[in-house]
């Protein structure tokens, strides 16, 4: 892992978050700090970042803007680690240096005695959005 992290090759980093993560506030702050550390210590200038907001079905099929706000509220300070500090960013560039992807694998039924567990896959737009973000990050 150290050789991959330390290489000068372009990398696409995917950081996974989820709404209503049932962890203490301190654990969430520690997770944000680990992401910050990873970004500052291991990434190189040409690396790209994807912030995956998994289990989006927990808060409904919300807009990207609402999902970003929910993610920002859940993981205090996370977005600041990716803020675009370029002087021209406020006029022309993106506010943050990541692609935000809403994601869900689908829904899982609660197993009941005598009834097999049930799984309903998500709509195709969720994995397609992740795939497109990865491809754009590789090409861009």
Show where each model-derived region lies.
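Inter-motif core of Ras-like GTPase G domains
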Residues: 1-24, 41
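Short, catalytically relevant binding-site loops at active-site mouths
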Residues: 20-22, 56-59
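Canonical P-loop GTPase G-domain recognition
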Residues: 50, 58-138
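Short glycine-/polar-rich loops that comprise or flank the Walker A/P-loop
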Residues: 8-12, 44-48, 94-97
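Amphipathic helical hotspot of TIR/SEFIR-family domains
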Residues: 23-44
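A generic secondary-structure signal
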Residues: 3, 34-41, 81, 85, ...
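Structural beta-sheet core signal
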Residues: 13-15, 51-53, 102
């Amino acid at each position: 892992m150290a050789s991959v992290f330390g290489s000068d090759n372009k990398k696409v980093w995917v950081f996974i978050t989820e709404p209503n993560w049932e962890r203490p506030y301190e654990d969430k702050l520690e997770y944000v700090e680990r992401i910050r550390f990873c970004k500052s210590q291991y990434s190189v200038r040409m690396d790209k970042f994807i912030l995956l907001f998994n289990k989006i079905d927990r808060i409904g099929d919300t807009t990207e803007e609402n999902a970003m706000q929910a993610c920002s509220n859940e993981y205090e300070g996370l977005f600041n680690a990716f803020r675009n500090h370029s002087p021209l960013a406020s006029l022309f560039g993106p506010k943050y240096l990541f692609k935000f992807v809403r994601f869900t694998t689908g829904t899982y039924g609660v197993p009941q005695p005598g009834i097999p567990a049930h799984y309903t896959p998500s709509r195709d737009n969720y994995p397609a959005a992740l795939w497109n973000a990865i491809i754009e990050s590789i090409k861009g």
